[in-house]
Amino acid sequence: MTNIALDLIGQSRLLFQHAAEAIGDTHEDALAFLRLEHEYHNALLVEQPNGNFADTVVRQYFYDAFNYLNYDALLKSEDEKLRAIAEKALKEVTYHRRWSSEWLIRLGDGTEESHAKAQTAVNLLWEYTGELFTPADFEQECIEKNISPNVAALRPAWLMHVSNILSQATLEMPSPDTWMQSGGKSGRHTEYLGYILADLQYMQRTYPEMQW
């Protein structure tokens, strides 16, 4: 899990650096550490708490399954740098998806307790998955310019992969048509993001522009 975290930090740095270059007059640390809560635009799924190990694995698997498809689609981006980032990241997220899916199968098809916890986590986190495939306003221009994929088009492949893994894990997949949470991509977050940002931003706000 530590290696996965390091991979995701590395991917984030590349994306923040690219965004800073496109915006101009800013840098990756400012984008990562100095924004206010409503200025972060992320899916609510990734700010859900770790909880127990089953919660962490299910959240990671749902995200990994999406991340793989997203980076694979970014290989066709009109943005040359995004294509390069995607090419590197795809190798990493392929491993991430394999790791989390194998652990989900172990938990679901394991003991009675691990199965129950895995099913509870699936049921709890499912309502946060729909937002992954709902384009936000800021994504529309990128979609129209073929900079990023239409995430809505990725959902059928995601559902197919998730259905297969949950079946192997002897877990029940909730209905794809159930009500879904949203708002994170528009800057409306759960209370959990505030705790994450308190840890994330502490050093940069206490010692601005500090260099290691």
PLM segments and residue spans:
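Domain-scale activation on soluble regions of proteins
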Residues: 18, 44, 72-74, 81, ...
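Inter-helical turn/loop segments and adjacent helix faces that build the functional surface
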Residues: 22, 71-88, 102-117, 135-144
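Acidic/His metal-coordination segments adjacent to aromatic residues that form catalytic metal sites
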Residues: 34-60, 107-114, 125-148
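Structural signal for well-ordered, non-membrane alpha-helices
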Residues: 9, 13-16, 72, 94, ...
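Internal, conserved structured core segments that host functional sites
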Residues: 45-99
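Extended, helix-rich structural scaffolds rather than catalytic motifs
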Residues: 116-212
